[in-house]
């Protein structure tokens, strides 16, 4: 029984699904997808639970959410192992994900008050008030790269605001989704407030097509995000928050410490086996001897990165990709770039057949025409050389995406110029592209999102503002508008 609907664990009536460890092939989870009728059942449960949940005070909802945070802390080791085994990422990185989930609770509570709390300003004849109200029933689509943290960033603020939820984890991480749901169950959420439906494309399409849905919160690929946008077009009554991918540029200008710059680049391009939406996909490197030395050092250090299993000791920097198919797609993308005229500096290699252990790849594309503006979701870095900083900015902006952009340079003036001219929701200076702060917004523009960033701003799309003009008494104004006559004279 792998679906959680209206406070009960039930068996899915859709297709059967098996999840294996992407490196060892070990069977981790077996279950059945939710069919369309069960998706509708989850929606009815969420709709029925909404009025009571929304009428609770914030303090009452906060008690449940904080209880969930405590359960995360007490079950940190177990959840870390589940996420690591299912995604293929090393234990150390999965542990940081669970820590981020715990920290998200306090941050979301603070953001609720700052972004969507209540305000009141006195007026001569009364007061003006601002309040926020929950949308109602929201669907949350989770990604596979951070199956705990990223859905958590939607679910927690949505629950705090008073919404009820139907959560569909990625079909590639059903075990993690179920494990998190069982902690919410222990936290004491009332039946129907949070419902779990497992499944792939068919389940997702049934969920996004629900008429009685008030909104959809999505983190994932641009292709799926575009499909959801088309599906919900013409329905302005439904809130749609899209956080999608990127073809992110990292500009390496003058550097004083080559090893520090190489470290930042590896953290930007290859952490999580390149499976972060903010990962650097395009390295823009200044022409010249220093750039040559940097590139040689980057290749040398990257060549030593050997992916390993989640529990290998000593721990590897990167683990496997989410699946063998995902790893093979990266290899295919590299082969296509090479066929276009790219110069391979470091070839990506599958370490074993039928696993997802893939070494990083680096390929120079300077002067190659027609390079696709697409995100390769894995450890593959493309390199272009530039002559002037103005040229670098033009190259950085030459993409339909707009998620993250970074600059490595000692010159503050160049960063100020980049801040003015970059088309990206995240612009970093001497920091990895993959670094993020939950106290700041997280999201992009263009094909990377629809201007509804998550993290600190998630509270914004989880509630709508209600403005009120208020007075505790009603009296006739001393001065009336022209043409109004309230005298006792009889009009003849």
Curated annotation (Swiss-Prot):
GO-annotated molecular function: aldehyde dehydrogenase [NAD(P)+] activity; succinylglutamate-semialdehyde dehydrogenase activity
Keyword tags: Arginine metabolism, NAD, Oxidoreductase
Any single GO BP term: arginine catabolic process to glutamate
Record PROSITE patterns: ALDEHYDE_DEHYDR_CYS (PS00070), ALDEHYDE_DEHYDR_GLU (PS00687)
Annotated InterPro entries: Ald_DH/histidinol_DH, Ald_DH_C, Ald_DH_CS_CYS, Ald_DH_CS_GLU, Ald_DH_N, Aldehyde_DH_dom, SuccinylGlu_semiald_DH_AstD
Keyword Cell cycle: no
EC numbers, comma separated: 1.2.1.71
Residues where NAD(+) binds: 220-225
Active site: 243, 277
Pathway: Amino-acid degradation; L-arginine degradation via AST pathway; L-glutamate and succinate from L-arginine: step 4/5
One Pfam family of this chain: Aldedh
Catalytic activity: N-succinyl-L-glutamate 5-semialdehyde + NAD(+) + H2O = N-succinyl-L-glutamate + NADH + 2 H(+)
NCBIfam families reported in the protein's UniProt record: arg_catab_astD, PRK09457.1
PANTHER family: ALDEHYDE DEHYDROGENASE-RELATED
Function: Catalyzes the NAD-dependent reduction of succinylglutamate semialdehyde into succinylglutamate.
Similarity comment: family membership: Belongs to the aldehyde dehydrogenase family. AstD subfamily.
Protein name in UniProt: N-succinylglutamate 5-semialdehyde dehydrogenase
